[in-house]
Amino acid sequence: MSATLQASSTTKDSPISETEFATLIDNEKDKLTDTHEFIRSITNQLSVKSSKFKFLVEVTSVSSSESITTNVTITSSIGSLWDDERDGYYSFKVQTKDVYLVTVYWIYAD
């Protein structure tokens, strides 16, 4: 299953498009079982997209040894002071055997 967008900012100057990031996640999703390796691979690929931005990648995994028969609510909050026109984020859901929430944040740093 491919990565599906769950949320995003309304940034004008995104260093990577939503589609490019979804493709990047899809190409690397086999590494999600080792989140450190997945994050390292994603950040290395993002670093060549633009030297004017710093990137943060967050992975949240949702798994259970038993079948989940009810809806699960996961809440995550983050706060920042940033430039709404240059800084932003994409948050994707990736369904494999487990569910992963992958978020990339970019901050303009020129």
From Swiss-Prot:
Disulfide bonds: none annotated. It comes from the Eukaryota. InterPro entries: Tctex-1-like, Tctex-1-like_sf. GO terms for cellular component: cell projection; cytoplasm. Keywords: Cell projection, Cytoplasm. It holds the Pfam family Tctex-1. The keyword Disulfide bond does not apply. Belongs to the TDA2 family. This is Topoisomerase I damage affected protein 2. It comes from Clavispora lusitaniae (strain ATCC 42720).
